[in-house]
């Protein structure tokens, strides 16, 4: 059986640094098509050898006219492989074929857009054009299109929001179809490109590698057992690294700016004597849970809220002291207890408390005092790359605040974080 890394019928995503690359990869896999994220500077020879069915160019934080901006090898366009270019990728494609890109009025967040009938939109736009809403995140604009391309989308601020060259099977979108919670038509656009234009068969399922993973784990356990039987020296280090950890940590060769530095990616010394085992490294969180269910793990384990590998230390903002951690543990326990009491714990994706080393004035027992601040954070998300703050009932928040302030003397104030991701991240550090 082939490993996931050499899976056939693959879509490649060339990463130019977009923080939505993780989301994009996951949306393609949700279409039951295997995809991999690769650095933008991958060689043409490697692409020829791997023979992907399609290529997606991600967005990125750069401008195509910057001196050190990442650029695609023009020979890639000559491979005859369908290409969907998103945001920065579209600007790059337009420029590479003779179009122009210039700074313009920025568009961020929800944006009304006009979609025109075309091959990419054929399942959402019939004979007439369609007005809908999409997710934008750009400042630069394609100002003139290359010869052989047509405009397929426009907004009030960006007249060229989508382009296509059906003869060469090249498509560009200034918006982000992968952010499906804010782009209702995005999944259908990706489905059309992946399954119809690229003719990718819907064969991918994380359960297909279950037998292979179990076999490898069994072999590893036997090998470790044999070695331990001969010596008490430790030989192995097992890590629960998943694919989102790898992508978010912006590994070498990728253009992505580091947003999260995961403790289990790139942090091990090169001369490490232990042998590293990472059986889940190329699976997303949801795919790991699917495997867990197939392996018979309990829902108590599979549905627990994520907890950071470094522990509570990243939820103490600033200097980390034992007394700060003690306060945070008590506050977090109260918060989770109240959520479970209100039967809300299983309805939200993640919830936790944070310790802020900020003292503010309060009145306790007719006396003036100063105490620390506790922030409460609860989010709803399907992939943890984007998310919305959870709308908790006021009576639940009131109960949490009252208990924390009354049961933890060092705390005088409780606040609730109502920031979405993006722009905020789920964890504060």
UniProtKB/Swiss-Prot annotation:
EC number(s) per entry: 6.3.5.2
Organism: Chlamydia pneumoniae (Chlamydophila pneumoniae)
Record-linked CDD domains: GATase1_GMP_Synthase, GMP_synthase_C
UniProt protein name: Putative GMP synthase [glutamine-hydrolyzing]
Pathway recorded for this protein: Purine metabolism; GMP biosynthesis; GMP from XMP (L-Gln route): step 1/1
Keyword terms of this UniProt record: ATP-binding, Glutamine amidotransferase, GMP biosynthesis, Ligase, Nucleotide-binding, Purine biosynthesis
Domain GMPS ATP-PPase stretches: 119-304
Gene that encodes the chain: guaA
Signal peptide start and end residues: none
Gene3D superfamilies reported for this sequence: 3.30.300.10, 3.40.50.880, HUPs
MF terms in GO: ATP binding; GMP synthase activity
The reaction(s) this protein catalyses: XMP + L-glutamine + ATP + H2O = GMP + L-glutamate + AMP + diphosphate + 2 H(+)
């Amino acid at each position: 059986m082939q490993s996931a890394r050499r899976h056939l019928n693959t879509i490649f995503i060339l990463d130019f640094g977009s923080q939505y690359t993780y989301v994009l990869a996951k949306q393609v896999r949700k279409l039951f098509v295997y995809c991999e994220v690769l650095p933008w500077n991958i060689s043409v020879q490697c692409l020829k050898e791997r023979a992907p069915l399609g290529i997606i160019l991600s967005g990125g934080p750069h401008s195509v006219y910057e001196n050190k901006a990442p650029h695609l090898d023009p020979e890639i366009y000559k491979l005859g492989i369908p290409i969907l270019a998103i945001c920065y990728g579209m600007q790059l494609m337009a420029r590479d074929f003779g179009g122009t890109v210039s700074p313009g009025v920025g568009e961020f967040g929800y944006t009304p857009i006009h979609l025109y009938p075309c091959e990419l939109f054929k399942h959402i736009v019939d004979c007439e054009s369609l007005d809908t809403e999409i997710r934008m995140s750009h400042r630069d604009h394609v100002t003139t299109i290359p010869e052989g391309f047509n405009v397929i989308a426009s907004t009030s601020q960006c007249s060229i929001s989508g382009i296509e060259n059906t003869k060469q099977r090249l498509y560009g979108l200034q918006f982000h179809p992968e952010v499906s919670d804010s782009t209702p038509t995005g999944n259908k656009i990706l489905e059309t490109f992946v399954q119809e234009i690229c003719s990718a068969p819907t064969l991918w399922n994380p359960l297909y590698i279950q037998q292979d993973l179990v076999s490898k784990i069994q072999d590893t356990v036997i090998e470790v057992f044999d070695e331990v039987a001969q010596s008490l020296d430790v030989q192995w280090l097992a890590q629960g690294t998943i694919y989102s950890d790898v992508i978010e940590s912006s590994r070498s060769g990728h253009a992505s700016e580091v947003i999260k530095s995961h403790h289990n990616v790139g942090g091990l010394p090169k001369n490490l004597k232990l042998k590293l085992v990472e059986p889940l490294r190329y699976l997303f969180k949801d795919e790991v849970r699917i495997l867990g269910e197939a392996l018979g793990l309990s829902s108590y384990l599979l549905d627990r809220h994520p907890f950071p590998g470094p522990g509570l230390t990243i939820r103490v903002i600033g200097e980390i002291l034992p007394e700060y951690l003690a306060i945070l543990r008590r506050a977090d326990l109260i918060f989770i207890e109240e959520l479970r009491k209100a039967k809300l714990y299983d309805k939200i994706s993640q919830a936790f408390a944070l310790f802020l080393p900020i003292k503010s004035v309060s009145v306790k027992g007719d006396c003036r005092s100063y105490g620390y601040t506790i922030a409460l954070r609860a989010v709803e998300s399907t992939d943890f790359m984007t998310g919305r703050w959870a709308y908790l009932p006021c009576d639940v928040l009131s109960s949490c605040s009252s208990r924390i302030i009354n049961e933890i003397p060092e705390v005088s104030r409780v606040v609730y974080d109502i920031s979405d991701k993006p722009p905020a991240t789920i964890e504060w550090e």
